[in-house]
Amino acid sequence: MENTNEITMEMLQKQVDALTKKVGKLEKNRKDQLAIAVVSGDLDKVLAAMVISLAAAAMDTQVKLFFSFWSLSALRDPKKHPKGKDFISKMFGIMLPTGKDKLTLSNMNMGGMGPMMIKMLMKKQNVMSLDEMFKQAGELGVEITICEMSMGLMGFKAEEMIDYPHLRYAGAATFVADAGESAMQLFI
């Protein structure tokens, strides 16, 4: 019986040592970086992503945002109207908000009154607007990646996206790589 316990303890110690080594390797490869997958196109959730991003960037943490699916509406420039879209792409363009100013709330949207009230409160309390947050994020070096697959599925084109200094187009594998090397990951 004692021999079995010794073998078991020895096996456990080897497993603990292997895990300790693996965790050490993972921690060593982590950067002071925040990766956020922004999937929701709701005003309150895009605001949350930007507030967290700005806070992290102000603390010298590298920030990488990955905009996918419904959140792409926030990155559409209402002044840009690309040509050559098929019927379904045009319909998505009509049905979805065009730009940050047209986003709705996830709760209490109240036919558009909710976003107006939030924006009024933000202004009254000297909170930056979403446009100002994106401008500051650009100045702080926050990177935004637009999911190419989502963009294609929803019929959006690169020509209709906002002008942003650190904007790139890539797939989900890019976000997985960014998240894998980040000390913090969020999904909004």
What are these regions (language model features)?
Residues 72-84:
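N-terminal beta-loop-helix "entrance" segment that forms/cooperates
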Residues 47-65:
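Histidine-anchored nucleotide/phosphate-binding helix
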Residues 83-122, 126-129:
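A glycine-rich helix N-cap at a beta->alpha junction
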Residues 36-47, 75-78, 121-125:
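Short, glycine-rich nucleotide/cofactor-binding loops
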Residues 122, 146, 151, 159-188:
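Glycine-rich, aromatic-bearing surface loops/beta-hairpins
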